[in-house]
Amino acid sequence: MRILFLADVYGAPGVAAIDGNLRSLRANLDLDCVIVNAENAADGAGLTPKLAERLLAAGADCLTLGNHVWRRKEIGPYLIEATRVVRPANLLDRLPGRGLTVIEVGEVKVAVINLLGSFTMEPAQSMFSVVDQLIDAAHRETPIVIVDVHAEATSEKVAMGWHLAGRATAVLGTHTHVQTSDVRVLPGGTAYITDAGMTGPHDSVIGAKKDISLRRFTLQQPQRLEPASGDVRLEGVLVTCGDDGRATAVEAFRHSV
């Protein structure tokens, strides 16, 4: 099975890149499943129901989120019914949505888990305290389990990779918008990368206009960030796995628009 995971979609340029390229990529790369982190789709922070439906219609099979999950107030009611969108599982259970979902891709089931790190993030349970139960629940449905670890600290993501080595098909880091060079298959057949990168404008400061971002640092004053527009790319990882859920290959993915 060939699974493409696309990293943080940033603003309108990232959404347009998915909308304009994913259908052809699915055909040209012979993809069976596409999972997209849509955490920054709405002007760089959060996701709206309209944008979620647009990304799914463009060819995404499942969307993951992160620390900006509640930035758009209309997303809460949507998450109650949206079975193909997951929010961090280690948030309070009483909040809308789910942190684990199982999607059907043809005749194959794929489980998708979303986790949120602790360092510099909104309050949440430790992702390590909930993930074992989630993995067990996923395995009752399918051996193919993809885990999106949305976290700032590289140590948290690396540790989760080792914690799930041999138990998840892939442990894929998101959030920093900078693709790391450590893509590999861990012992036991778990594809891993510390950060899968960003789908959006790379002539930017991690997606935002450079001049606005620079004013935040040079003036030390809050600035309302706006998505940049230049050098738009789709970034992520391409995972190949067998029916047993073990990854046999993984490679970093980058496609310029």
Positions of the model-derived regions?
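Acidic, metal/ion-coordinating pockets
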Residues: 1-257
